Swiss-Prot record:
InterPro entries according to UniProt: OPRT, Or_phspho_trans_dom, PRibTrfase_dom, PRTase-like
Keywords: Glycosyltransferase, Magnesium, Pyrimidine biosynthesis, Transferase
Gene encoding the protein: pyrE
Subunit field text: Homodimer.
MF-aspect GO terms: magnesium ion binding; orotate phosphoribosyltransferase activity
Cofactors that this protein relies on: Mg(2+)
Binding residues annotated for orotate, in chain numbering: 124
Record protein name field: Orotate phosphoribosyltransferase
Family: Belongs to the purine/pyrimidine phosphoribosyltransferase family. PyrE subfamily.
EC number(s) from the headed UniProt entry: 2.4.2.10
Upper lineage: Bacteria, Bacillati, Bacillota, Bacilli, Bacillales
Pathway(s) served: Pyrimidine metabolism; UMP biosynthesis via de novo pathway; UMP from orotate: step 1/2
PROSITE patterns noted in UniProt: PUR_PYR_PR_TRANSFER
């Protein structure tokens, strides 16, 4: 499953690997990878595979789920497809409450005591997913965990999720993606080394000259 999804993401250009010409994230950090899972929306076969995979993860790890919650905005569409497949209620959670109208942060019904699974497109440092989890908990929901399409497998993300006491499972990850990219001849040994060094310590730009 992990390599299959990784292959899909590479084929449609949802993930770019540029170890020799790094991207600059909004945080200012240099990165050899850029992930835009919104592109999956434009590829029916890919998004169907993702929805089926997320459903499988949820059934395996969170079988008692009652509500599917998407993170705004990237997780909304995937949450909708998954909830439809599972015939479950769905809501989505904003990064913060609206400044007008009812001032909702949670759109749709997620009632006190209900068991909820969060659907996220990407786990990097885990910030947006944790914001979603906290909002649902404040509303009295029991958050069973998070499922996502892809994770960078960053230690910072793992630590934040552990600190928030929330389980998280991804369809694919950085390790599987770099392995598939190497198998496809998209990266060579030198590039693979840089990619591996970056994941060990993203904040240390020494990987650029590795």
């Amino acid at each position: 499953m992990k390599k299959e999804i990784a292959s899909h993401l590479l084929e449609i250009g949802a993930v770019f690997l540029q170890p020799n010409d790094p991207f600059t994230w909004s945080s200012g950090m240099k990165s050899p990878i850029y992930c835009d899972n919104r592109l999956t929306l434009s590829y029916p076969k890919v998004r169907q595979a993702i929805a089926a995979g997320l459903e499988e993860l949820i059934k395996e790890h969170f079988p008692t789920v009652e509500v599917i919650a998407g993170t705004a905005t990237a997780g909304i569409a995937h949450a909708a497809w998954v909830s439809d497949r599972m015939d479950l209620p769905m809501c989505y959670v904003r990064s913060k409450a609206k400044g007008h109208g009812k001032g909702n942060q949670i759109e749709g019904k997620a009632e006190k005591g209900q068991k909820v699974v969060v659907v996220e497109d990407l786990i990097s440092t885990g910030g947006s997913a944790i914001t979603c989890v906290e909002a649902l908990r404040e509303a009295g929901c029991e958050v069973l965990g998070i499922v996502s399409i892809f994770t960078y497998e960053l230690e910072a993300g793992k630590e934040k999720l552990e600190a928030a006491n929330v389980a998280s499972y991804s369809l694919s990850d950085y390790s599987a993606l770099t392995e598939v990219a190497a198998e496809k001849g998209m990266i060579g040994q030198a590039e693979t080394k840089k990619l591996q060094e970056w994941r060990k310590n993203p904040a240390d730009e020494a990987w650029i000259t590795a």
